[in-house]
């Protein structure tokens, strides 16, 4: 039964990969099965990638995955027991030396650059995932997309949350870190059918230190 379900899922995902779907599908398998890859060309050595190494670059250039349909396919794999727990985050892909890479932006980073500033130059990505278990690190990304130079993390996250919630049968709980504990995110998510839990960091005038509180978005209750 599990094998049949896996085969059904793979066949459905294959249909949503757009152009160059054969090479893209095999590239996906190669990524899953390759423990260490130091370049894209290394993935062409995987036994499941039955093409020559240039096909990897052609697949990435030509493929146009149908993100909405893939998200709907992922949602079908979610448990229907209880309310789904979603987690959103913004991560940086540091590319400070890739001067020819388009759409590089200034991103927050825990590793400082020259001048001891906690930033890097690269690309930012916004992810919203389903967290299915009480313990462990496994999660199912429902949307994972680059934040373009004309967007910001707040706009992207709110849009992604809206897209996910419109396709969920049950009102979810979504959790976010302090980057999203701000008025713009509160306003942009006020009409989304989800209960939002985020941290707010603020300077206490009386204690002179950073404090964290929790806020439930759509009901506007502070805890």
Model-derived features with residue positions:
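Active-site-proximal, Lys/Arg-enriched surface segment
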Residues: 59-135
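A common structural microfeature
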Residues: 28, 37-40, 53, 82-87, ...
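A short, flexible helix-boundary coil/loop motif
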Residues: 1-20, 31, 42, 132-148, ...
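Gly/serine-rich nucleotide phosphate-binding loop at the start of the catalytic core
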Residues: 1-61, 65
